[in-house]
Amino acid sequence: MAKEGIGADWPVFGPYSPGVKVDGIIWLAGQIAPDAGDIAEQTQASLDKIDVLLAAAGVTKHQVTFVQVLLDDINNFAAMNDVYGAWLSDVEIPPARAAFEAAALPRGAAVEIVAQAHEDA
């Protein structure tokens, strides 16, 4: 199967695709929302972007298999985790996840969320 771009019409600030799909596997670039407000609002806005990209790829959050969360301050973990947990509240098997602090995130974001999904998950 050929490589398919997801969200090719989205504005980006570098040489990358918002998402790529090959053989039923979907990789999404890190999603940020630095203008959304506090950590909870940025987390929700980033997850909303992920939902839109997943839909464009023909899947939902129920098919997400791995998530990576980067925080500009690990002390924001609990606030991010509350929003993240609510997003997954109806998902039977949550994805594997890594979460850690990064020295700085693009555009001054407080959180960046990367996701992978599979059509057959």
Model-derived regions, located:
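N-terminal presequence-like segments and the immediate start of the first folded domain
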Residues: 1-65, 71-121
